Amino acid sequence: MVNHCDSNLIAPIVKKLAQRASVEVALNFDHGEEIGLLKKALVDGYSSVMVDASRYNLEGNIRMTREIVEFAKQFDASVEGEIGCMGASEGDNYTDDDMKTNPDEALRFAKETGIDALAISFGSSHGNYPEGYVPEFDFERLKEIKEKTKMPLVLHGGSGSGDENIKRCVEFGINKICLLYTSPSPRDCS
């Protein structure tokens, strides 16, 4: 949103288009890293926000996410939080076991923030994977987090994860799968 269009310009357009849709449409602000921008998106009419405070320690992540959860209540908007470190498919940030979500921390995070959905890290990465590469997901970790939190779980970095991985994610408890981490530039759309 920030790089492409101000939320007070895009929200009314999308809401108007959503009224014409035959299915429910959510206007989601994904990977909000700044409290001010997240609050602005909610004020401007976004129906959900994803708080990405995973760069902070657990306490900082809880604090920021809880603040947005409390703020979002007045708009009846949903809030997704993220715990664990999502890798990147390029550069030196490949997913490693120590970057995956800790199930006990996931439970604490969910309880202390009051989020509606939880994005977890269990082997996926943002961005496009190298050709022919299929990530290895830790389905036992996913299962344990689902059993502990008993809440909707989110997979970020679903693009290129492979059909079998996606099917198993749903079987093991993923409720939302995010594809395409970044928007294409206008020149890519022609």
Regions found by a protein language model. Name each.
Residues K16-R20, E34-V51, R55, R66, ...:
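Alpha/beta enzyme core
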Residues V25-F29, V49-V51, V79-G81, L118-I120, ...:
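Hydrophobic faces of well-ordered beta-strands that scaffold small-molecule active sites
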Residues M1-L37:
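Active-site cofactor/substrate anionic-group-binding motifs, chiefly glycine-
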Residues Y181-S190:
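Single conserved hydrophobic/aromatic residue that forms the stacking wall/gate
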Residues Q19-E24, E147-P152, E171-G173:
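Short, surface-exposed connector motifs at secondary-structure boundaries
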Residues M1-V2, S54-Y56, L180:
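Short, acidic/turn-prone active-site loops that include or flank metal/cofactor-
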Residues A117-K167:
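Catalytic alpha/beta core domains of metabolic enzymes, predominantly
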Residues G36-K40, G160-F172:
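Catalytic cores of alpha/beta
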